[in-house]
Amino acid sequence: MKTLETKKAPAAIGPYSQAKMTGNFLLASGQIPVDPATGEVAGDKIETQAEQSCKNVGAILEEAGLTFDNVIKTTCFLADMADFAAFNAVYEKYFTSKPARSCVAVKQL
């Protein structure tokens, strides 16, 4: 099993890794909308935050030699389901292969 870390995505803030890979199977930790260059949350709009989160996922995939087309399942957490359509507009630009997905609201995000 290989631990993956990249400076192109936010560093883990706890006792976990950005991702683990075994064979061709990658499990990535959840990605928040933090710009790894600044350590700051990317804006205050859902579109900007979704874009940054997707860029962070992309950086981890790249480190593993994978692309968004290799993703088979995602789990998305929104602070407010009213942002669902705006989030999807960004999400579908990255996840064009339409992986299986769960999306829920978590009020304390």
For the regions a protein language model found, what residue spans apply to each?
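Short, polar/acidic, helix-capping and beta-turn segments at strand->helix junctions
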Residues: M1-L109
